[in-house]
C-alpha cells in the first residue's frame, strides 16, 4: 500500500506544488491540510481556472514516469508512411483506417488477466467408485456451488500398459456422462450419443481421445462443456462411464480405483479385462486415482462477487471520490512526440474523509487503515492527531509509444499510472 499511495500522491503533489507557486492574489489562500490529497478538496471548483495548473502537473508527472527531464525535441519527425509501416511490422500497435495509431496495451490485458485469475478458484475432486463397473462418481466441492463460469475442466485418467505390449500402438478412450431422467423427459435433439437404460437413464458422450498404448502415463480429457451444463442446472454430482474397447487386446488398463472401492471388487476386476485397476500394489494404485480438475469463477452479476467501488465525483458529494480528468496530447501540443495513446486519463482523488467512513469497507482496502481509525476515534495516542486522507486504492497500468531525442520509437509499460478507485486512508 505505501507504494500505491506514493504513486497516487505524486500526481497530487505536482498539482499542489504548481498551485502553491506565488501568483497574484494567492496570498489569501489558507494553508494546505496535513496530507496532499486532502488539499485537493480545498482547491477551487471552477474547472476552467484550475485546468491549466492541472495540465502542468500532468506534464511533470508523465515526464517523471518516463524518466525524462524534458520533452524530447522532435525537430525532424519520421515520415508518417515509414512510421506506420514500422508499427505494422513490429506489431507494437494497430493503425486505423484514418491513420491513427492504437497501441497494443499488453500490460493492461495482463493486469486484467491477473485480476481475473485472482477471482478464479481451482478445485481438485478425486473420483469415487460408481454404482457399476467402469464407472466413476465425482462430487464437486461446496466451494464450487458459488461458481458459475467454468474456465477449464479436465478429467485425469492413468493408463497402465504392460512392458511386453507391442500389439497395438493406439487405443481410443471414451467418457460418457450418465444421467437420470424421468420417463419422456429426455430431449431427442441433444447433440450427443445417448443410450437408454430402462427408460430412466441416458448416456452422453462428453470426451473422446486416441492415446498412445505403448507407455504408462496420465491422459487428460477436457470436459468443460459438461461441467458448465452441470453448474447451469444447479447440480454438483457427475457420474462417468469409461469405455476402452481396445484396452483388453493390448493388455492396457485404466486405473479406475475410487476411494469407496472394496478389495473384493478390486479382485473381481483383476479377473476380467483389468480396467478396474488390475495389478500393482494397492498404495501405488491409489496414487493413480482419477480426479477432476476444475477452474471456475463467479459470474459478473453474482451478488457476492460485486465489491463496493470507490465513489465517482459528480459535483453532489463532498466525501472522498475519484475525479475524472482527461488530457489530450494534441491539445497540449505533445502529439508530435507521443505516438499513442491519444491522451492520458489523469484521474485523481479529492474529498473529505469523515471518521465514520475512514477505513470502512469500500472506502479503503487497508486493514491497517481500519485499525488506525479505530484508535483515532477513541483518542488513543499516538493516533489521536492523525488525519485520514483521500488516496488512490486501486491503480492500473498504461502503455505509451513515443519518440526519444534520437528519433527512436520507444514502447514503455508504466505501472500504477491511472487512478481507478479512491478511498480514505
Swiss-Prot record:
GO cellular-component terms in the record?
A: activin A complex; enzyme activator complex; extracellular region; extracellular space; inhibin A complex; perinuclear region of cytoplasm
Which UniProt key words apply to this protein?
Answer: Cleavage on pair of basic residues, Disulfide bond, Glycoprotein, Growth factor, Hormone, Secreted, Signal
The Gene Ontology biological process annotation of the record reads:
activin receptor signaling pathway; androgen metabolic process; androst-4-ene-3,17-dione biosynthetic process; endodermal cell differentiation; extrinsic apoptotic signaling pathway; eyelid development in camera-type eye; hair follicle development; hematopoietic progenitor cell differentiation
| Bias (Basic and acidic residues) ranges | 263-275
User: Which pairs of Cys residues are joined through disulfide bonds in the record?
Assistant: 313-321, 320-390, 349-422, 353-424
Q: Which residues form the propeptide?
A: 21-309
Q: Which residues are glycosylated?
A: 165
Q: Output the superkingdom of the source species.
A: Eukaryota
Q: Could you give the subunit structure recorded for this chain? A: Dimeric, linked by one or more disulfide bonds. Inhibin A is a dimer of alpha/INHA and beta-A/INHBA. Activin A is a homodimer of beta-A/INHBA. Activin AB is a dimer of beta-A/INHBA and beta-B/INHBB. Interacts with FST and FSTL3; these interactions prevent activin A interaction to its type II receptor. Activin A interacts with ACVR2A. Activin A interacts with BMPR2. Inhibin A interacts with ACVR1; this interaction creates a non-signaling complex (NSC) that inhibits ACVR1-mediated BMP signaling. Inhibin A interacts with ACVR2A.
Which family is annotated?
Answer: Belongs to the TGF-beta family.
- Can you say what this protein is called? Inhibin beta A chain
**Organism, as annotated:** Bos taurus (Bovine)
Amino acid at each position: 500500500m505505501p507504494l500505491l499511495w506514493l504513486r497516487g500522491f505524486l500526481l497530487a503533489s505536482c498539482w499542489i506544488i504548481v498551485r502553491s507557486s506565488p501568483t497574484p492574489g494567492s496570498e489569501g489562500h489558507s494553508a494546505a491540510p496535513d496530507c496532499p490529497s486532502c488539499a485537493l478538496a480545498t482547491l477551487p471548483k471552477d474547472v476552467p481556472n484550475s485546468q491549466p495548473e492541472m495540465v502542468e502537473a500532468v506534464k511533470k508527472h508523465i515526464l517523471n514516469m518516463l524518466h525524462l527531464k524534458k520533452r524530447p525535441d522532435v525537430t525532424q519527425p519520421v515520415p508518417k508512411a515509414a512510421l506506420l509501416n514500422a508499427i505494422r511490422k513490429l506489431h507494437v500497435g494497430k493503425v486505423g483506417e484514418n491513420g491513427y495509431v492504437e497501441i497494443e496495451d499488453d500490460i493492461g490485458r495482463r493486469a486484467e488477466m491477473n485480476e481475473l485469475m485472482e477471482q478464479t478458484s481451482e478445485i481438485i475432486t478425486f473420483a469415487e467408485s460408481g454404482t457399476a463397473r467402469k464407472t466413476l462418481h465425482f462430487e464437486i466441492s461446496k466451494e464450487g456451488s458459488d461458481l458459475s463460469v467454468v474456465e477449464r475442466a479436465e478429467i485425469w485418467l492413468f493408463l497402465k500398459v504392460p512392458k511386453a505390449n507391442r500389439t497395438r500402438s493406439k487405443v481410443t478412450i471414451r467418457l460418457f456422462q450418465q444421467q437420470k431422467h424421468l420417463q419422456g423427459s429426455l430431449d431427442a435433439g441433444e447433440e450427443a450419443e445417448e443410450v437408454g437404460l430402462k427408460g430412466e437413464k441416458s448416456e452422453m458422450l462428453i470426451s473422446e481421445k486416441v492415446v498412445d498404448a505403448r507407455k504408462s502415463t496420465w491422459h487428460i480429457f477436457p470436459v468443460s462443456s459438461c461441467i458448465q451444463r452441470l453448474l447451469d442446472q444447479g447440480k454438483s454430482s457427475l457420474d462417468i462411464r469409461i469405455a476402452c474397447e481396445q484396452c483388453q487386446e493390448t493388455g492396457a488398463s485404466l486405473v479406475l480405483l475410487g476411494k469407496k472401492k472394496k478389495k473384493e471388487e478390486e479382485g473381481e476386476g483383476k479377473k476380467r479385462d483389468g480396467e478396474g485397476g488390475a495389478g500393482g500394489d494397492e498404495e501405488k494404485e491409489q496414487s493413480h486415482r482419477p480426479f477432476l480438475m476444475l477452474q471456475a469463477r463467479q459470474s459478473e452479476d453474482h451478488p457476492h462477487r460485486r465489491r463496493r467501488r470507490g465513489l465517482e465525483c459528480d459535483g453532489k458529494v463532498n466525501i472522498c471520490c475519484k475525479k475524472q480528468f482527461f488530457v489530450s496530447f494534441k491539445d497540449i501540443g505533445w502529439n508530435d512526440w507521443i505516438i499513442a495513446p491519444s491522451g492520458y486519463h489523469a484521474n485523481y482523488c479529492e474529498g473529505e474523509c469523515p471518521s465514520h467512513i475512514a477505513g470502512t469497507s469500500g472506502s479503503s482496502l487497508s486493514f491497517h487503515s481500519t485499525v488506525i481509525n479505530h484508535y483515532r476515534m477513541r483518542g488513543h495516542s499516538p493516533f489521536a492527531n492523525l488525519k485520514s486522507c483521500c488516496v488512490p486504492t486501486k491503480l492500473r497500468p498504461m502503455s505509451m509509444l513515443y519518440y526519444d531525442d534520437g528519433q527512436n520509437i520507444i514502447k514503455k509499460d508504466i505501472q500504477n499510472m491511472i487512478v481507478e478507485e479512491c478511498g480514505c486512508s
